């Protein structure tokens, strides 16, 4: 006491209060009581006017918080404190009956009440006993499930506020409920009762609180149960707040307390009706972290789940915790308010809940027809597992799909309840199956078939399917030729792949978006939505066979119906591609076109035409199986089936919004498909490639690949089959899209692919005509449309189409087509250029097989170069393997592997003249877009007067050669590459260019005449040649294309550096290539010869490309290049093939002076392709495979290519690579084909080149080739190479067909180029960029050069642009840069080559890159959205 006295004066409130509490250790006291003790015992000197109570209260508040606090605020009471060290005792007492551990609220309430009642200032002891008594009395309450508040927990002011709010609410409730409820009207002391009751209710309802929470959180979504829960939860909260309320109540006795507890049990807080006290309570005050923490753990966890993720934290123990601001933010506040309002509106009354539920049921009803398509996640119905779906979705184009799959189940409940029923209830696979079953049988079958194709896509099933497909396809390629085999195969695949296909198909159907690529693949099979779905399934595996069979049957039919079928097909195909890309809507469009056929197609599908049906199911397949075939490609998606031809109809005509949309869709789809299709392509490559055999047949297996192509290419193939007899022309006339492919199939009229091969010369004229000649002079306009259509369908399709177009030229081409189709998505396509190679190898080979009638061709001939079988298989396998990582892997693998394969294809080509076609097809496919453009060339030509990207032209061309270039409109050829490179390239490529020009002219004419005769072709070629030589100045265009490339990389420099050093380099590269391609060894010489001529070949179509390829083979590699190659190949092989190609690119033809030259060119083309490949090899990354494939051919051409392409490749590696790859493939094949033809030797122009048989010293060859190319280039350049060449050179193509060759491709390329331009390198698969370089003939040049055409020689310059066009699919895959855009553009261009580029009237404006696709267009065109028209349409 002495110490106390001494310190009394200086003692703080905290010390005084501590002293008091120490004296009465087990007696919690309120601040008033403490003050009384202090005053009584004089523990602190209290001066007057200091408001001691306030000071003490503030001190207690402060010191009861935090770890440092010396006081412990008793939880349930208003202001009752005890010393922290005494807490254990107090807690013990409190926890009598586990009060503390029991509901902290109830505990605090009772204690609070007691303290309040004892407030009167009873002595501490009384207080203590009272407290104890309370504790015991509340003890029952403590029994409540809610967790205890830890001893350290103190009620915070917020809690106090909530208590106040509760108090008020309770008063009202008390009044209201005194009458209503069994609660006796308790006197005011009853307040306490109420509070207890409430507490009890709260504790009872605690479990419900989660629901309450939920109710609050879920804005009115919660049903009555939730509401009741929420009401309970609020009651719980109320309980918390109530705890403090008791304070007011008067002293109560133990029995009162007990009675209270009992009453509370039956008393409940109304949380349903508007009478609820909660309506007038601020829920935010009732619900806070303190009241929340009082709830039982399980309730807290359940309630936390109702909160947004941001408002809950997951602790290290995995338990969720309340975020600091979770219950204290505007969202929770508004939710609480909203819940209160809904409560007051009676929304939670049982009657209302019932009504609401009924409404939801009504709303959520999905139309039955929709229900069968519903999938909780993409691909569910097709049997994809959620993981697979996510993978597919993730890599392809549909992130949302990926996301949705997981999320969908949640969202599904309301709108997708029915579906969910199926999906959730049943296992996913079951669900899928269910859904499939739900769908019409046809649909189911279709699904299956699609699934089959899809397996390629789906990672898990992919390998199996692809293996199965491969084996089936391979084994069935020949067998499939006969319907019986087909059926067997079909059945087999169907059984094995049925489930997968079903699932996949569903997936495809459900998520068209998801993997449009996939869709591409699937679409073919899927397209056979009709009853013949099963067959469609087989189609993928045995699709080639069935298609082939179909093709054979229809071939005859085609001959008769080819014009109409083709037309129908091309339209359908074109439409179909869009359908698949556009997804269902496009299908509808297609439907319109195809409705007449639709019913019939299904039947057809049922029949053995299934494969065709795949392509044409929506088409009037009945008209001819060929029709169905076109559908097949078109059939990218099951939906496409009916509407397969919607877009197509326009393709040839004016560019309608639908066309634009279709194009955009295609591009978009291609992008998505790039990945999906890349995977699919890979799978298709493996499985699809084999299917490759026939544009139609190949499609079966390649349905995945070609099926995708099917949309664009397959239809063509099928169409070709349909128009097998002369569909080429027809195709050209028809629609490039389907037409192109049709053209190819035309070749294989006899059999889809087999026939192609079988009738390479015979059909090739048509095929070429159709494929390449889709650009045939006669059909150019249509082809333009055709090309456009093809473009529109999808880059892949286009490429496929192109490939297919080429296919007719050569069976291999068909394969390539298939392969491209595999690349169907742009991916494959882009890759296809290179994948085309692979496709060619694996696909082309198959084509060979088809052509030869033996799968062997596929492995054997194809394998010629690398290892046909291995290559083919590898390619196919790789694609399959790649499938999992659709885009990249596929692209890379497909490209690399496929490229080599294409070489193989090339090699094979020699084996069979068709095989060269195969190689060409790759190139052709690349070129095809160009060709398409070329065809459109005339269309575009009008617009080619001024460079579309003047600034680019100026900058890229560096203004030296700009005059020409500037003049050139370079329609989308962003590549107005530097002119400078042109020079170097020009020099070395001059000769080639000249030759190319000549060849191109000749080729062009030959393209027209190709169908007629080699001789005629020669004449035409010569005529054209003479014509085109003047076009040589077109080099500018070439340059422009090249520029494109350069712009990506230092193509210019490369080209510039081409000079001797580069040439030497190239020579060495060529030598390497030659060595590599010893098989092609023989070809290499000719290839080299062709390489010179190649430029011409490139110019032509193929030849032009080669020349370009040689000088700037890379450039020539562009879409056109492929075409050119094809042309050349055809030419070399038989003027027919070439002619066809030329036909496709009549303008290109000029390149080939004569059949011999054509042959030479063809060979050169082959070589060029090889060279390009080599060049690519330099850009190995980009076009490794292509390099291989193109090796021998490339060897010679490579020097130039190495120089130009090498650098160009490097710069536009991906583009170049792809282009080269394709070109190379085509070239190789061509070369081979040509070699076999031996025509190349005949090529006088490229005479100095080597006979195809010759295996000159690699260096010599390369040197000769370069020299020849240079000479030609010089001439051409002199004439126009200088202007054109720069472009070409710039492009990568170098001199290539800067003039003509470039022109033609440019036509198509313009669109592509820009895309490519943006990211040539990025777009490894976009080798098409090179195609870009290839100049098409005058016509093409004109058309193509809207932006980059010199002036008079529209065709010449244009070629370059085309390059990009081919790239679309790949580029789509390579979203990396412009490549992606290119697909759109390419498509657009191809699709509506009609002048997408040429239609742009702001050539002089600055060009900017589209953010969506990477395509380049004018600032005015793109506008503030920074999106091109295609992207805008798609969006």
UniProtKB/Swiss-Prot annotation:
GO CC annotations, alphabetized: nucleoplasm; PR-DUB complex
Main subcellular location: nucleus
PROSITE patterns: DEUBAD, HTH_HARE
Domain HTH HARE-type, first and last residues per copy: 11-86
Compositional bias ranges of the Basic and acidic residues kind: 581-592, 1002-1012
PHD-type ZnF: 1397-1434
Ranges of Low complexity composition bias in the record: 103-121, 136-146, 167-181, 906-925
Positions marked as site (Breakpoint for translocation to form KAT6A-ASXL2 protein): 20-21
Motif interval(s): LXXLL motif 2: 887-891
Source taxon at top rank: Eukaryota
Residues bearing the modification Phosphoserine: 146, 524, 562, 571, 600, 637, 648, 1319
Keywords: Chromosomal rearrangement, Intellectual disability, Metal-binding, Methylation, Nucleus, Phosphoprotein, Repeat, Repressor, Transcription, Transcription regulation, Ubl conjugation pathway, Zinc, Zinc-finger
Bias (Polar residues): 182-195, 451-463, 506-527, 593-603, 750-770, 815-827, 864-875, 926-935, 1013-1029, 1200-1225
Annotated Acidic residues bias: 1179-1191
Subcellular location: Nucleus
Positions bearing Asymmetric dimethylarginine: 641
Disease (UniProt): Shashi-Pena syndrome: An autosomal dominant syndrome characterized by delayed psychomotor development, intellectual disability of variable severity, macrocephaly, prominent eyes, arched eyebrows, hypertelorism, a glabellar nevus flammeus, neonatal feeding difficulties, and hypotonia. Some patients may also have atrial septal defect, episodic hypoglycemia, changes in bone mineral density, and/or seizures.
Role description: Putative Polycomb group (PcG) protein. PcG proteins act by forming multiprotein complexes, which are required to maintain the transcriptionally repressive state of homeotic genes throughout development. PcG proteins are not required to initiate repression, but to maintain it during later stages of development. They probably act via methylation of histones, rendering chromatin heritably changed in its expressibility. Involved in transcriptional regulation mediated by ligand-bound nuclear hormone receptors, such as peroxisome proliferator-activated receptor gamma (PPARG).
The protein's assembly and partners: Core component of the polycomb repressive deubiquitinase (PR-DUB) complex, at least composed of BAP1, one of ASXL1, ASXL2 or (probably) ASXL3, and one of MBD5 or MBD6. Distinct combinations of ASXL and MBD proteins may preferentially bind specific histone modification marks. The PR-DUB core associates with a number of accessory proteins, including FOXK1, FOXK2, KDM1B, HCFC1 and OGT; KDM1B specifically associates with ASXL2 PR-DUB complexes.
Domain notes: Contains two Leu-Xaa-Xaa-Leu-Leu (LXXLL) motifs, which may be required for an association with nuclear receptors.
Name assigned to this protein: Putative Polycomb group protein ASXL2
Organism: Homo sapiens (Human)
């Amino acid at each position: 006491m002495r110490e106390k006295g001494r310190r009394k004066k200086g003692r703080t409130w905290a010390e005084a209060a501590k002293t008091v509490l120490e004296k009465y250790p087990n007696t919690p006291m309120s601040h008033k009581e403490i003050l009384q003790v202090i005053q009584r015992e004089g523990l602190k000197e209290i001066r007057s006017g200091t408001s001691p109570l306030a000071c003490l209260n503030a001190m207690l508040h402060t010191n009861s918080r935090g770890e440092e606090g010396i006081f412990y605020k008793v939880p349930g009471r208003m202001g009752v404190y005890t010393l922290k060290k005494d807490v254990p005792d107090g807690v013990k007492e409190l926890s009598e009956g586990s009060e503390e551990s029991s509901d902290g609220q109830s505990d605090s309430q009772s204690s609070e009440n007691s303290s309040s009642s004892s407030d009167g200032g009873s002595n501490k002891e009384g207080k203590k006993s009272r407290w104890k008594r309370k504790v015991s009395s509340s003890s029952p309450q403590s029994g409540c499930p809610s967790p205890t508040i830890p001893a350290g927990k103190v009620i915070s002011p917020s809690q106090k506020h909530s208590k106040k709010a509760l108090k008020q609410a309770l008063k009202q409730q008390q009044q209201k409920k005194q009458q209503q409820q069994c609660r006796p009207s308790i006197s005011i002391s009853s307040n306490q009762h109420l509070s207890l009751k409430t507490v009890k209710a709260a504790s009872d309802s605690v479990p419900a609180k989660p629901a309450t929470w939920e109710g609050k959180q879920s804005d009115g979504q919660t049903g009555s149960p939730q509401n009741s829960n929420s009401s309970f939860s609020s009651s719980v909260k109320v309980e918390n707040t109530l705890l403090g309320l008791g304070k007011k109540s008067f002293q109560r006795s133990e029995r009162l307390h007990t009675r209270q507890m009992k009453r509370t049990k039956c008393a409940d807080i109304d949380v349903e009706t508007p009478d609820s006290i909660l309506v007038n309570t601020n829920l935010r005050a009732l619900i806070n972290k303190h009241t929340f923490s009082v709830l039982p753990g399980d309730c807290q966890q359940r309630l936390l789940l109702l909160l947004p993720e941001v408002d809950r934290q997951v602790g290290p123990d995995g338990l969720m915790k309340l975020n600091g601001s979770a219950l204290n933010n505007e969202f929770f506040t508004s939710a609480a308010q909203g819940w209160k309002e809904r409560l007051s509106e009676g929304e939670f009354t049982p009657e209302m809940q019932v009504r609401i539920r009924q409404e939801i049921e009504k709303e959520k009803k999905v139309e039955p027809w929709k229900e069968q398509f519903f999938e909780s996640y993409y691909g569910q119905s097709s049997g994809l597992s959620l993981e697979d779906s996510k993978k597919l979705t993730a890599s392809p184009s549909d992130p949302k799909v990926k996301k949705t799959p997981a999320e969908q189940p949640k969202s599904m409940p309301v709108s997708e309840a029915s579906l969910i029923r199926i999906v959730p209830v049943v296992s996913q696979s079951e669900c899928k199956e269910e859904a499939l079953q739900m769908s019409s049988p046809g649909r189911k079958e279709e699904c299956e078939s699609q699934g089959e194709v899809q397996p390629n896509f789906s990672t898990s099933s992919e390998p199996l399917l692809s293996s199965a497909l491969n084996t089936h396809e391979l084994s069935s390629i020949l067998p499939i030729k006969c319907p019986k085999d087909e059926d067997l195969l079909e059945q087999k695949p169907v059984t094995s792949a049925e489930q997968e296909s079903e699932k996949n198909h569903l997936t495809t159907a459900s998520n068209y978006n998801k993997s449009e690529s996939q869709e591409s693949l699937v679409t073919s099979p899927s397209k056979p939505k009709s009853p013949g779905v099963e067959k469609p399934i087989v189609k993928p595996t045995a699709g080639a066979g069935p298609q082939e069979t179909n093709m054979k049957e229809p071939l005859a039919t085609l001959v008769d119906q080819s014009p109409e079928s083709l037309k129908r097909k091309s339209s359908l195909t074109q439409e179909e591609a869009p359908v698949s890309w556009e997804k269902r809507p496009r299908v509808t469009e297609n439907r319109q076109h195809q409705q007449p056929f639709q019913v019939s197609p299904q039947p057809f599908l049922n029949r053995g035409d299934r494969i065709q049906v795949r392509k044409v199911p929506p088409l009037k397949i009945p008209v001819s199986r060929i029709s169905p075939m076109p559908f097949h490609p078109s059939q990218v998606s099951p939906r496409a089936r009916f509407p397969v031809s919607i877009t197509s109809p326009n393709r040839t005509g004016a560019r309608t919004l639908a066309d634009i949309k279709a194009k955009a869709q295609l591009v978009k789809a291609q992008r998505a498909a790039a990945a999906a299709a890349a995977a699919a392509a890979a799978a298709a490559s493996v499985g699809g490639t084999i299917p490759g055999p026939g544009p139609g047949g190949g499609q079966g297996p390649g349905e995945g690949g070609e099926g995708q192509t099917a949309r664009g290419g397959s239809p063509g193939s099928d169409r070709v089959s349909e128009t097998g007899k002369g569909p080429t022309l027809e195709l050209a006339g028809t629609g490039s899209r389907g037409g192109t492919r049709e053209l190819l199939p035309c070749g294989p009229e006899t059999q889809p692919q087999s026939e192609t091969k079988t009738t390479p010369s015979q059909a090739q004229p048509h095929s070429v005509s159709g494929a390449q000649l889709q650009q045939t002079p006669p059909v150019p306009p249509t082809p333009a449309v055709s090309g456009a259509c093809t473009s529109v369908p999808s880059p892949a399709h286009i490429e496929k189409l192109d490939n297919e177009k080429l296919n007719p030229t050569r069976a291999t081409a068909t394969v390539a087509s298939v392969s491209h189709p595999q690349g169907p998505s742009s991916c494959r396509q882009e890759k296809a250029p290179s994948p085309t190679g692979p496709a060619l190898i694996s696909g082309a080979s198959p084509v060979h097989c088809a052509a030869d009638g033996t799968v062997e061709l596929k492995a054997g001939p194809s394998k010629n170069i690398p290892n046909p079988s291995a290559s083919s298989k590898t390619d196919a396998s790789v694609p399959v393997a790649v499938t999992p990582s659709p885009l990249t892997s596929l692209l890379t693998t497909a490209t690399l592997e496929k490229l080599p394969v294409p070489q193989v294809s090339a090699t094979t080509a020699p084996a069979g003249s068709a095989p060269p076609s195969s190689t060409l097809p790759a190139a052709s496919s690349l070129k095809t877009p160009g060709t398409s453009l070329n065809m459109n060339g005339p269309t575009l030509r009008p617009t080619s007067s001024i460079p579309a990207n003047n600034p680019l032209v100026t900058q890229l061309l560096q203004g030296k050669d700009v005059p020409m270039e500037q003049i050139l409109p370079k329609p989308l050829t962003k590549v107005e590459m530097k002119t400078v490179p042109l020079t170097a390239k020009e020099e070395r490529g001059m000769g080639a260019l000249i030759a190319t020009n000549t060849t191109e002219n000749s080729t062009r004419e030959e393209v027209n005449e190709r169908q007629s005769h080699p001789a005629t072709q020669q004449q035409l070629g010569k005529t054209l040649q003479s014509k085109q030589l003047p076009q040589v100045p077109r080099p500018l265009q070439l340059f422009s294309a090249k520029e494109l490339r350069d712009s990506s990389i230092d193509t210019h420099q490369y080209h510039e550096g081409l000079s001797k050093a580069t040439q030497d380099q190239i020579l060495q590269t060529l030598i390497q290539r030659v060595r590599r391609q010893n098989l092609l060894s023989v070809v290499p010489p000719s290839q080299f010869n062709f390489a010179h001529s190649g430029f011409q070949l490139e110019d032509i179509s193929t030849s032009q490309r080669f020349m370009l390829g040689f000088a700037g083979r890379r450039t020539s590699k562009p879409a056109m290049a492929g075409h050119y190659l094809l042309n050349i190949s055809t030419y070399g092989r038989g003027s027919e093939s070439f002619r066809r190609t030329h036909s496709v690119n009549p303008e290109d033809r000029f390149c080939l002076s004569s059949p011999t030259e054509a042959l030479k060119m063809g060979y050169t083309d082959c070589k060029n392709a090889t060279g390009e490949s080599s060049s690519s090899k330099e850009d190995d990354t980009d076009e490794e495979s292509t390099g291989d494939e193109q090796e021998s051919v490339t060897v010679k051409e490579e020097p130039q290519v190495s120089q130009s392409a090498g650098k160009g490749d490097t710069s536009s590696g991906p583009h170049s690579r792809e282009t080269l790859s394709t070109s190379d493939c085509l070239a190789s094949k061509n070369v081979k084909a040509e070699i076999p033809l031996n025509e190349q030797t005949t090529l006088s122009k490229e005479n100095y080149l080597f006979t195809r048989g010759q295996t000159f010293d690699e260096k010599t060859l390369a040197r000769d080739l370069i020299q020849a190319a240079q000479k030609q280039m010089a001439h051409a350049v002199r004439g126009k190479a200088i202007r054109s060449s720069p472009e070409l050179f710039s492009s990568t193509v170098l001199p290539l067909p800067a003039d003509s060759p470039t022109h033609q491709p440019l036509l198509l390329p313009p669109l592509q180029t820009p895309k490519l331009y943006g990211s040539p390198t990025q777009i490894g698969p976009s080798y098409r960029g090179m195609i870009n370089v290839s100049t098409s003939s005058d016509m093409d040049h004109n058309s193509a050069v809207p932006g980059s055409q010199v002036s008079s020689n529209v065709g010449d310059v244009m070629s370059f642009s085309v390059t990009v066009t081919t790239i679309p699919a790949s580029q789509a895959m390579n979203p990396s840069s412009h490549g992606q855009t290119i697909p759109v553009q390419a498509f657009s261009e191809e699709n509506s080559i009609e002048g997408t580029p040429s239609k742009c009237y702001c050539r002089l404006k600055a060009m900017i890159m589209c953010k969506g696709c990477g395509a380049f267009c004018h600032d005015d065109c793109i506008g503030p959205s920074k999106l091109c028209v295609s992207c805008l349409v798609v969006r």
